[in-house]
Regions:
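C-terminal cap of metal-dependent C-N hydrolases
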Residues: 35, 308-309, 313-314, 386-392, ...
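Divalent-metal coordination cores built from histidine and acidic residues
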Residues: 80-85, 96, 100-190, 210, ...
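Acidic, glycine-enriched loop/beta-strand segments at the rims
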Residues: 37-49, 374-384, 428-432, 440-477
Length: 510
């Protein structure tokens, strides 16, 4: 009965929208027919056809019944029999350089039609983000792009750099830059575990949040410390910014935390904030290893090469002890898998054996704080899986076309393959909601993320049982499979396992 009610409501609303009269010649560029449509709302799939014109969904109806009283002119008909038709996925936290690798085939192959850049506090180093976006548009891009303004970049542009306290003039300049660039971006990102953002005090972050809130934008935060013994304080810092703006926890994790009960404690903190009127959301990726520069294990006073060189003569013993304790706390040297040459594919434990020296000495004498990047197996499956199940937690890849972590090529496929099909811990309709309408709501994107009349025709077609995340840590660049057709703005962008030469993406603006 509920299925019939949903279908009736859709059809009634669409009749009102389209105002088409019997006997008309109805022209459509594309019709996707015979599929089971998940509209992105979390409702169950219904069998209905989707009609597209000029890159937009213009009708949702049954083709056979529509053709009884109308003459139809259809450019192409796509038979989706036996497949799910859903909105294209939206990645709320992505990486990449669209001027260097504009195709973004890694995302298209896993059903992603919109990505977000300018993350972790870093955006293009320009005072006029709109100009850079125009360059991307002129070159063309394979997916849609939503931009963030990076807090760290704002610090650099306003002359603050790594200073802990801005001057009044610097602070005013930073606020002005944020305000002007929020006209074309969807929020501000912070990377408080990285330089220069880690130097920012609460007052600075609150002032920036006030500007973001005034523009109805979101704060997308790589929080100050994701370690299990510090994450409550990091959440509290972000929630305080929620007094002024919507706030979002990027790639939420509890490093070396354990168990579903621990996840419940963290989710309860966020729920308590919502009950006080704050708007706070989060995302996760479905892997138990993070990926970033090796500087993540170095102390705050030795993260840059300059800091490291200055500290080493007097504090070498202290640094060695810090590194030894921190790496062991993060599941030991065998849990750090390096992903950059000449160490690619080797753990710190492997290097210990090869070089016959303690890993802390290898980090100090050979690698240094900026000499490598790697995957860190520091997350607990039970904890992360419980986070994923929460209604206010979405999905991101935190990945890129060129990164050495499988999340950049596999995240969205793995959600379907692992959590929907194998574990059955997420209903397909809920998984799709997290990756479509919920993601759009987090970002403030109003014209994507749903199969509705008036929405952009970013659509995907797949058989859930056939979806595979093929990327692995040894082979992180293997494309996902199972997403047979991906439309971006009404045009085919990915088909039969390959991207198309035409780039159909748009650079989105609020």
């Amino acid at each position: 009965m509920s299925r019939l009610i949903i279908l009736l409501a859709i059809l009634l609303s669409l009749d009102a929208c389209t105002e088409q009269q019997p006997g008309e010649i109805l022209r459509f560029d594309t019709v996707i027919e015979n599929g089971m449509v998940l509209d992105g709302s979390g409702s169950e799939a219904i069998e209905v056809d989707v009609f597209i014109r000029a890159g937009e969904i213009v009708l949702i109806d049954e083709l056979d019944s529509l053709s009884v009283n109308n003459e139809l002119e259809i450019g192409q008909r796509i038979d989706a029999s036996g497949h799910i038709v859903a909105p294209g996925f939206i990645d709320v936290h992505s990486h990449g350089d669209p001027l260097e690798t504009p195709a973004f085939e890694n995302f298209l192959a896993q059903g992603v039609t919109t990505i977000t850049l300018g993350q972790d506090g870093y955006s293009p180093a320009t005072e006029n983000l709109s100009q850079w976006m125009n360059e991307v548009e002129a070159q063309g891009i394979g997916v849609n792009l939503a931009m963030f303004v990076g807090h760290g970049t704002l610090r650099e542009l306003s002359g603050i750099g790594r200073d802990p306290i801005p001057t009044a003039e610097q602070m005013q300049r930073m606020l002005e830059l944020l305000d002007s660039n929020l006209e074309v971006s969807f929020g501000m990102s912070t990377g408080l575990e990285y330089n220069p953002g880690l130097n920012a005090a609460e007052a600075e972050l609150l002032a920036l949040a006030e500007v973001a809130g005034r523009n109805n934008r979101v704060i997308m935060s790589h929080m100050r410390n994701e370690d299990d013994d510090a994450i409550e304080a990091s959440l509290a810092e972000l929630i305080a910014q929620g007094e002024y703006a919507r706030v979002h926890v990027a790639h939420m994790k509890s490093v070396y935390g354990r168990g579903a009960a621990r996840a419940e404690e963290l989710l309860a903190l966020m729920q308590a904030a919502r009950e006080r009127g704050y708007q706070i959301t989060a995302d996760v990726y479905p892997y138990n290893a993070s990926y970033t520069g090796i500087g993540i294990v170095f102390p705050v006073w030795a993260k840059t090469q300059e800091q490291f060189d200055a500290a080493l003569p007097a504090r070498r013993e202290e640094l060695a002890e810090y590194l030894r304790n921190r790496v062991n706390l993060r599941n030991g040297p065998e849990a750090t898998l390096l992903g950059t040459d000449p160490y690619t594919g080797k753990t710190l434990a492997d290097l210990e054996q090869e070089m016959n020296m303690p890993f802390e000495d290898i980090l100090i004498d050979i690698i240094g704080p900026q000499g490598a990047s790697g995957a860190y197996f520091v997350m607990n499956d039970e904890l992360q899986s419980r986070l994923l199940e929460d209604a206010y937690v979405g999905v991101s890849s935190d990945g890129s076309p060129t990164g050495f972590h499988p999340r950049g090529h596999g995240t969205f496929a793995k959600i379907i393959e692992e959590y929907v099909v194998k574990r059955e811990s997420l209903a397909l309709s809920e998984a799709v909601r997290k990756m479509t309408s919920f993601a759009a709501d987090i970002l403030g994107i109003t014209d994507r993320g749903r199969v509705e009349v008036g929405q952009a025709a970013d659509l995907i077609m797949f058989d859930p049982a056939a979806v595979r995340a093929r990327a692995t840590y040894p082979e992180p660049h293997e494309l996902a499979s199972g997403f047979e057709l991906v439309l971006v703005n009404g045009e085919i962008a990915f088909k039969d396992g390959a991207g198309q030469s035409q780039r159909n993406g748009e650079v989105l603006r609020p």
